[in-house]
Regions:
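A short, charged/proline- and glycine-enriched loop
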Residues: 1, 22-35, 54-55, 119-121
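Histidine-anchored nucleotide/phosphate-binding helix
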Residues: 42-61, 136-140
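Short N-terminal or domain-adjacent regulatory/targeting segments
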Residues: 1-29, 105-106
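Cysteine-centered metal-binding/redox modules
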Residues: 3-17, 151-596
């Protein structure tokens, strides 16, 4: 059997220029890896070759008869084509030469180690597993190439080296899936070109709006990312009418199923929040919101040019691979406009999102030494920045402390950054010098100080995806809270649209705060001003939705029946009416110090 000395001898004879050329592509990531192809069945080999080369994987065809058959079928062979006819020892020698050149290693063990860790490959055996082929495949395993075959493999492969974190040999793999399994076993990061689109796609378009008079289709609904099993990479399912048929307002749902060796449930919300950034780079598309409060507005001009829901799925598939190929290897997307299907996704999403929200348990800000920033929404509000702690989730409600921590573990240099709490300035309002410094840097100077716990002094900013607005009501010495679904006027004399203009541009406004619903269930919600005790008015639907959360807080502090002390549009339309209601219910705000 071939050994490491044989491979190094072959490396000395390898074409230096070709090894350097391909080696550079390995190192810069433009070539994700290589495959060693064994077998003689040309009919089976051709679609595999097409799949490998389409994904920029270099193929070494290592059997002479297969080389001849492929050439006779009209397929170009050679270094430029990425399908290279070499014997197994010469192919491994070429990889060894790349390791020597770019890894600056020469000892056999060092060359083998560099090849396994940095030059990732796998062996494909199409056809009969003869002793000679198995011997060649076992030699390739030294370089980090597991064997995959469409046929069952003999028991002898069970004795092969199993010290790596990938399987050494896998038999009985479906030919349609064999390349994907190889990619997953060795963790190759495939770069996908942007699909052909009828519209322009560039970050230059992020932040654009699609007003009513130019909107061809306005979709509202839910988006969900889950870790899936037995999914097909690149499959795009459209269930229901497409946007060329759907006019005006329409419900919609999108289910994105992800799998990969490094994928885990904690990463799901991180990927979920990337949908907005990916879609907003398309000319004529405006995406706002997350979870079950998504709005997707598509301009009529984009529809007229031929844009369809399938294009959105294709863009999402490619960009998720390109941005997060280090954790995922398969992305399957289903888009629904059929109402019966949408309801099923909504129910599934609600259950999953509730479980995600429970992960933090009783973790408090005082229990951790690191907070996180999130600048994901700066494409729609340039100066905006979220500071995320266990008791201070992002204003969108979709990114909490665990999500941000997971995002940093995936992409250390990305939309989220870790900030160590240092230089406490004021514990009551929640200010630290290190947090202020991070806020100044990442907001481009728009935010000079950031209070996590105060409504009145240096409150945080908001973008366009916040769920609620809290605003001071001076006469009642309290605050009102409304959510985006409320269309009526508030006791402040402003409706949601007016309040949105005040808080939704990325600049902090004392006395006004855009935030998530989840924030109201924490002990740190405007705690500098007294917290939940300050709430004197809410729109009725929001009050009832958050009743369990607010009752739990109030009961724990010895204020039973607190939620019914909060006025709504059903009994109070002005601040004067609120004040009378507070006196009738003996609201605790009457005993509190003035906010101003």
């Amino acid at each position: 059997m071939l050994n490491s000395s044989d491979i190094l001898s072959a490396a000395e004879l390898a074409d230096s220029a070709k090894a350097r050329q391909k080696g550079l592509a390995f190192i810069d990531g433009s070539v994700p890896g290589y495959a060693l192809l064994l077998g003689s069945d040309t009919t089976k080999a051709l679609p595999i070759l097409e799949s490998l080369t389409r994904q920029q994987i270099v193929v070494f065809v290592v059997e002479e008869q297969l080389q001849t058959n492929i050439k006779e079928s009209g397929v170009s062979l050679g270094w430029d084509a990425g399908i290279i006819p070499l014997t197994m020892i010469k192919a491994l020698g070429c990889i060894g030469r790349v390791a020597q050149t770019f890894g600056n290693v020469n000892e056999p063990d060092d060359v083998m180690r560099y090849s396994r860790e940095r030059l990732r490959g796998f062996t494909l055996l199409i056809g009969e597993s003869t002793p000679e082929r198995l011997e060649l495949a076992q030699a390739a395993l030294m370089m980090g190439c597991p064997l995959l075959s469409d046929n069952q493999l003999p028991q002898s492969v069970n004795e092969w080296d199993k010290s790596a974190d990938y399987r050494s040999a896998i038999g009985g793999v479906d030919l349609h899936d064999i390349v994907q399994v190889g990619i997953e076993e060795r963790g190759l990061q495939i770069k996908f070109p942007l699909p052909e689109l009828p519209i322009a796609y560039s970050s230059d378009f992020s932040g654009q709006t699609v007003p009513d008079d130019s909107c061809g289709s306005c979709l509202t609904g839910v988006e969900l990312v889950v870790t899936g099993e037995n999914i097909t990479d690149g499959r795009i399912n459209i269930i229901g009418l497409d946007i060329d048929t759907v006019k005006g307002n329409q419900s919609y749902a999108m289910l994105i199923e992800i799998s990969g060796r490094e994928m885990q449930p904690d990463f799901e919300p991180v990927l979920e929040r990337q949908i907005e950034t990916i879609f907003n780079n398309a000319d004529g598309i405006m995406h706002r919101g997350q979870r079950a409060m998504v709005t997707l507005r598509i301009a009529q001009k984009a529809i007229d040019k031929g844009l369809r829901l399938r294009h959105l799925g294709e863009v999402l598939h490619a960009q998720l691979h390109n941005e997060f190929g280090n954790i995922l290897s398969r992305v399957q997307i289903s888009i629904f406009t059929e109402m019966s299907q949408i309801q099923a996704i909504q129910e599934k999403a609600q259950s999953i999102h509730e479980k995600r929200d429970q992960r933090l348990g009783n973790l408090r800000d005082e229990d951790v030494d690191t907070f996180y920033t999130c600048n994901l929404c700066q494409t729609i509000a340039a100066g905006h920045l979220c500071i995320i702690s266990p008791e201070h989730p992002g204003v969108c409600g979709a990114v909490d402390w665990m999500d941000a921590r997971a995002a940093v573990s995936i992409q250390p240099v990305g939309s989220n950054k870790a900030v160590v709490k240092e230089g406490l300035l004021d514990a009551q309002i929640g200010q630290w010098e290190s947090i202020n410094q991070a806020a100044r840097q990442e907001s481009g100077g728009e935010i000079t100080a950031y209070s996590l716990y105060s409504l009145m002094e240096d409150p945080g900013s908001a973008c366009g995806d916040f769920e609620c607005i809290t605003a001071m009501l001076p006469l009642s010495n309290g605050v009102m809270v409304i959510d985006h679904t409320y269309e009526g006027m508030t006791p402040s004399g402003m409706d949601w649209a007016m309040l949105f203009e005040m808080v939704g541009a990325g600049s902090p406004t004392p006395g006004f705060l855009g935030h998530s619903k989840r924030l109201m269930g924490t002990h740190k919600f405007i705690s500098a001003e007294g917290g939940w005790r300050r709430i004197v008015w809410m729109n009725h639907a929001l009050r009832e939705e958050l009743r369990p959360m607010l009752e739990a807080l109030a009961n724990k502090e010895g204020v039973p029946g607190f939620v019914d002390m909060i006025a709504t549009e059903q009994n109070c339309e002005s601040e004067e009416e609120i004040l009378l209601y507070l006196e009738e219910t003996s609201h605790p705000v009457l005993m509190m110090e003035p906010m101003m």
